[in-house]
């Protein structure tokens, strides 16, 4: 265990030096925050942090501005005759009861749904207690950004390893050849890959080896790589199948240390037999010989790894692509070994990653229920988030009448968000747990504000499940809440849970529900909940964190290992503790009953005919892909002035040759049309994108009446999700295909009806 250096720190709420872990992304940068006269005076990287060692990005420096944002909601609000009124917490909970209880009494709990947003993954309180709301409220179907994000990876990991969050991550600190597909860590800082200063690590790889980026766009990551291979969107699975074909055809397969724990090699051989490099070269845009060369490079390099992320997930063959990345790593001997793809060993396990009852052992028993309108089947407890709007729009028995949103803005972040924007006012009840009056929450009847990140502790449970080192780092709050008697976010969720089950929100026994949740978590670890609960004089997320640390791989297990980790001992190390890099964990990390990696799950093999039918594309077709920016995080950091500086980022990027054929120039306003809808947006020409591909960022579309986002509304941008057809999906997982959307682009002056 490597502890950090300890220097004098100010107590919570006092002026002076504070340490805090940035909660915005997988980089989890350690911050040093200076507070003067009760305000954030400066933020810099904490050089003593055992994880990030002083690294930080622009988002981390914005925490003070976020905390002090005058638009941030600090007091509960209810809507009266169309106008917002600030009220007491008790009155806000009473209003929740007045709204939601009649809906449940009249229509049943099936008329209620919840949407939980991306910030939950980084929230100390919400991340641990969303499971209480979704698991105990009785709400039958809820929605999340998971099905416009990583759900294909959840699916492939469930089928291969028997755990829906059992993700192998690239050991980038020890690899010599890194192949990046559909990821841009220069902007994301890593995704489903937690590492400090990813781009710095990539520079180190280049000094001793090689970095290759395969992407339709020459991203900031690709610009700093040794090689950029532009690929046609949606063909990644075909490309990877050709890699697999070469490995098998040229006898390059080496299962390495996991040879005795891999099942399905012959099924994989049969599946790849029809996918030689020559078959996919034209479709992918990558020459057949380069495909074969890359297969040989991967097989011939001792420490190499392929890393695929959101560009592979958010496409119509996301499950196949996510699966095949792992297949290539396994077949080349770069699985469960240093420098390859390895399973992390987090110091604290996350409550999010608990097995789903009935789906243990990686069984493909999906479709346990389906949506009313489309008949979309459940996969791993989720249905496509794009189904939510049609379930509200379509009359009849089972129509959604009430919505609870938690830290989410689905009007901007989900397919057909413009339709959701139109139907939300028709709901009979809408309750939002949120910090801002945004494009979604403006439709709510009640807004229950959470705390600023700096007003609550932090420990990144979920993100540390993807970390290349076993690290734990607890951050105390920097400030006390403005109202010391206000409920914390976890208490809000428990009250809403009780309300859904028939108890008025204002009368819910928060402690009893919290103890019941804690008792269940203890049970999953083979502990007696009553005995363990008696050791605490408090509940809430700190109790949960202590238990997950103590029952983790380095914990004291409540006295069984006296020198083990506890929350109290972690608090004594304000710069964190680092237990070292990933270690081989097969078969222990597997959740399959036979301890085997299932290389060729039949559920995924059954999707190959669909790929075969779609792999050949119209060469004149334009397709849209998404992009992100270092100073943005989905839709929720656009109200920070420091992050909004510079030129307009919400543009359609197009290759100069494609623009010339259409008579377009940089700065022109164009109409972009898909089967999902149409938008107008300025165009920006570049050579750094594959011809036939256009790109837009997501998370924009501000400027709507009734929002309270002064800075964001000054640079509203356009909502690209209007172009996302709700039924354009990765069929095995139900994940939205937000990349590879066929579009037309015309000058707005020439567009019919413009």
Where are these regions (language model features)?
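Internal, active-site/partner-interface "lid" segment
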Residues: 252-274, 505-523
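Extended redox/cofactor-interaction regions of prokaryotic respiratory oxidoreductases
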Residues: 127-203, 207-214, 238-241, 327-442, ...
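Catalytic, metal-anchored helix/loop core of enzyme active sites in primary metabolism
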Residues: 445
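Short beta-alpha connecting loops at secondary-structure transitions
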Residues: 223-231, 454, 458-461, 470-482
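Active-site phosphate/pyrophosphate-binding segments
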Residues: 243, 261-385
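Flexible, glycine/charged-enriched surface loops at secondary-structure junctions
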Residues: 107-111, 253-258, 305, 336-343, ...
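N-terminal export/assembly segments and adjacent metallocofactor-ligating motifs
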Residues: 1-250, 287, 374, 378, ...
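Long, contiguous, secondary-structure-rich segments that constitute the structural scaffold
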Residues: 477-551, 635-653, 657-754
